[in-house]
């Protein structure tokens, strides 16, 4: 099973991806769960992650870099793990590119999707979109990057992008709302409830 977490900065993706990974490890064993992230996930991608999140480059160049990193990530880590029957959990994936580069920076959405289709990027089985108020999210964000220097309007566009993705991809995407008013355990419980509905036979919390 391939599961991804999406949302604006400060929405709690990293925390929830770690909690879910630990849950699956308790069920299936430490070696049967892969927790990864984007940008990153491979030696190649991790080497340029810092520059990509700090340096200002053209949106199309940025898209091409993200896509090449994602292709490498899929080929070297995600697909081999899935073929071995492992559960893969990823902090950000294709939907972040659609939201940030597409809705936020104005790159044509069809170009993003066509490019990913060309290199045969696999879509996740389940995606959790953690929806949070923009200003609350930015105040909670721990990892500072170039995007946080953008205007509030930029982040509103990204949030809207994630919301529209969830509507268009409703079979795959699950939106967790009210993040700012819930503690991590409450959000985690809602995520586990969704997992149970998607995959029967999981042991109770």
Swiss-Prot record:
GO function term, MF aspect, one: ATP binding
InterPro entries: P-loop_NTPase, Thymidylate_kin-like_dom, Thymidylate_kin_CS, Thymidylate_kinase
Positions with a binding annotation for ATP: 7-14
Enzyme superclass (EC): transferase
Gene Ontology CC terms: cytosol
Gene Ontology BP term (one): dTTP biosynthetic process
Cross-referenced Pfam families: Thymidylate_kin
Spans through the membrane: none
Gene3D superfamilies (UniProt xref): P-loop containing nucleotide triphosphate hydrolases (3.40.50.300)
EC number(s) reported in the record: 2.7.4.9
Keyword terms of this UniProt record: ATP-binding, Kinase, Nucleotide biosynthesis, Nucleotide-binding, Transferase
Recorded catalytic activity of this chain's protein: dTMP + ATP = dTDP + ADP
Similarity comment: Belongs to the thymidylate kinase family.
Function text: Phosphorylation of dTMP to form dTDP in both de novo and salvage pathways of dTTP synthesis.
Name of the protein in its database record: Thymidylate kinase
Organism from which the protein derives: Wolbachia pipientis subsp. Culex pipiens (strain wPip)
Lineage start: Bacteria, Pseudomonadati, Pseudomonadota, Alphaproteobacteria, Rickettsiales
Gene designation: tmk
